[in-house]
């Protein structure tokens, strides 16, 4: 899988999402639950805004000194016996991982959940050279079996219910039991455990890399990443170049923010800090590789969008977004969905494929308020819109003409007065009662799904004149 998950046009993807009543119900329920849990966890911590400010400060400091911390990380990983590779492009990253697999003559690879490995199409690259790649995260495993893309950053199978999952397991894996979650989880556990033991290579992502120790931090709810890191003889960790922290002290702050913002917990079930195996350690990989991926991030770092790199992938913005609530994750056409996806995806994938995403927002600002590291997401969405209009001339000719006419009318008192007088008569063939009828010309996309009030026959100026102090009415 790559970052792009659909070839459909944006409007078609949105239409599919709106028509999927189960998905919208599941997303609404999950958003409400995660939002409530996040507020409770934040309240328990106390002075949440101060923690957010500290998180923002840490992320900004790290990005401002990213070259220093990346070199420090590389030196310390190398000192501990690991190998570090800096990949400028996603193709370079995938090729390096292919080369490691070829060198090890690997046939089976097991991996934990990782957005950046999907971004670089790692699974496809390994399958090209004959490797079987197994997802060990339960949600990702379900989607892999069903050949379905993720719809949420931390809950990839959010759009499926247990009956659908049971049917997938029955059709693809021969599962014969009920749709009870416990039974299905037990079935998957047996499937995965057997393959864990046979895998030659384990691949993980990286929530944070600690510069001064050469360590990686992984945060999971299932413990699958621990097995990926400890059973296979070779481990490959893949990280976006921005996922750095200077020391364990900063890591402590960001993990606390991540867990509370993502799922409303003080800590997830498993927080693991590890790296290349040391002489005194009894388990872990014999060989360790760290792949640091740029893939456009250095360009973002030097642009007006650099604040998006503060993201810690908690999905708090996704869990409060009203647009995501109604259209779901697949509508974004990218592995990165929600407000963070609408900002990040056009930067990584370009405006040609993703120029609609910055407009998939009501600009309500809920995402900015929810972000634990204070990324001004709605401001960045507006910046995208500005760039698109200036560079791409996105607006259709009819829209440009309509806006030009409105600008002329709104800036002239005489024209505005004349227009307000003519509007009721001009719209009368299209009105029913006090509302505009459905399917009216260029207003169709609005009037088909929302009530559009008909122009009032009484102008405000006339009403005010009659009702001002001393008036008769």
UniProtKB/Swiss-Prot annotation:
The lineage of its organism: Bacteria, Bacillati, Bacillota, Bacilli, Bacillales. [4Fe-4S] cluster 2 binds at residues 321, 364, 367. [4Fe-4S] cluster 1 binds at residues 311, 314, 317, 371. It comes from the Bacteria. GO terms for molecular function: 4 iron, 4 sulfur cluster binding; metal ion binding. NCBIfam families: LutB/LldF family L-lactate oxidation iron-sulfur protein. This is Lactate utilization protein B. Keywords: 4Fe-4S, Electron transport, Iron, Iron-sulfur, Metal-binding, Repeat, Transport. Belongs to the LutB/YkgF family.
């Amino acid at each position: 899988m790559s970052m792009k998950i659909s070839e459909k046009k944006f409007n078609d993807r949105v239409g599919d999402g709106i028509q999927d009543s189960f998905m919208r119900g599941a997303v609404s329920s999950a958003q409400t639950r995660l939002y409530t849990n996040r507020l409770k966890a934040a309240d328990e911590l106390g002075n949440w805004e101060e923690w957010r400010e500290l998180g923002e400060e840490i992320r900004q400091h790290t990005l401002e000194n990213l070259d220093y911390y990346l070199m420090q990380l590389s030196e310390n990983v190398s000192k501990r016996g690991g190998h570090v590779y800096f990949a400028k492009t996603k193709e370079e990253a995938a090729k390096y991982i292919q080369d490691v697999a070829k060198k090890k003559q690997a046939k089976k690879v097991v991996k934990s959940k990782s957005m950046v490995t999907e971004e670089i199409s790692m699974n496809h690259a390994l399958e090209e050279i004959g490797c079987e790649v197994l997802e060990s995260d339960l949600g990702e495993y379900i989607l892999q079996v069903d050949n379905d893309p993720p719809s949420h950053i931390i809950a990839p199978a959010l759009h499926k219910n247990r009956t659908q999952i049971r049917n997938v397991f029955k059709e693809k894996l021969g599962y014969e039991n009920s749709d009870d979650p416990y039974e299905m989880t037990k079935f998957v556990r047996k499937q995965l455990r057997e393959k864990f033991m046979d895998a030659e290579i384990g691949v993980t992502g990286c929530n944070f890399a600690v510069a001064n120790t050469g360590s990686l931090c992984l945060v999971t709810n299932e413990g699958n990443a621990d097995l990926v890191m400890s059973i296979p003889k070779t481990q490959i960790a893949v990280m976006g170049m921005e996922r750095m922290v200077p020391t364990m002290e900063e890591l402590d702050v960001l993990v606390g923010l991540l867990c509370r913002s993502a799922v409303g917990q003080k800590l997830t079930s498993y927080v693991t800090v590890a790296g290349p195996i040391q002489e005194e350690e009894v388990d872990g990989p014999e060989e360790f590789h760290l792949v640091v991926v740029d893939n456009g991030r250095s360009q973002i770092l030097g642009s007006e969008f650099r604040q998006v790199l503060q993201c810690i992938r908690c999905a708090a913005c996704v869990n409060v977004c009203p647009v995501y609530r109604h259209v779901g994750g697949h509508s974004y056409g990218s592995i990165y969905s929600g407000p963070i996806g609408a900002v990040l995806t056009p930067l990584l994938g370009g405006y040609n494929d993703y120029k609609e995403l910055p407009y998939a927002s009501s600009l309500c600002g809920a995402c900015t308020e929810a972000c634990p590291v204070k990324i001004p997401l709605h401001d960045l969405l507006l910046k995208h819109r500005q760039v698109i209009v200036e560079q791409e001339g996105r607006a259709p000719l009819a829209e440009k003409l309509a806006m030009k006419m409105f600008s002329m009318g709104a800036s002239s008192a005489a024209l505005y007065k004349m227009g307000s007088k003519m509007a009721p008569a001009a719209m009368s063939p299209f009105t029913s009662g006090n509302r505009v009828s459905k399917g009216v010309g260029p207003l169709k996309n609005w009037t088909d799904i929302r009530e559009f009030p008909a122009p009032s026959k009484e102008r405000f100026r006339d009403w005010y004149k009659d009702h001002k102090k001393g008036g008769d009415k």
